[in-house]
Regions:
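Positively charged, polar, low-complexity stretches
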Residues: 2-85
């Protein structure tokens, strides 16, 4: 079983190595600030969101398309921490 410490390291690396620079900055900035504070359920949500394609995620962040219900809570948490514009 993966330890919390290993999981956090894996998520941090994954956050900074996305498919697009925009998503690197969004996810990377968020995990640098808040990753240690997330509980197991929030980490699950973050991991599920990060499993989506960047081309789908970016429009959710910018409000160009509707966010799937499964990702709303974690996306709102990230948006509360990151200023896009």
């Amino acid at each position: 079983m993966e330890t919390r410490e290993h999981r956090l390291k894996r998520l941090k690396i994954r956050a900074w190595r996305r498919g697009t620079k925009e998503m690197d900055l969004i996810f990377g900035s968020f995990v640098n600030r808040k990753l240690e504070e997330l509980d197991a359920a929030e980490l699950d949500s973050l991991e599920a969101l990060m499993a989506e394609n960047d081309t789908d995620i970016y429009p959710w962040f910018t409000g160009q398309s509707k966010v799937p219900p499964a990702h709303r809570e974690i996306l709102q948490k990230i948006q509360g921490e990151i200023k896009l514009f």
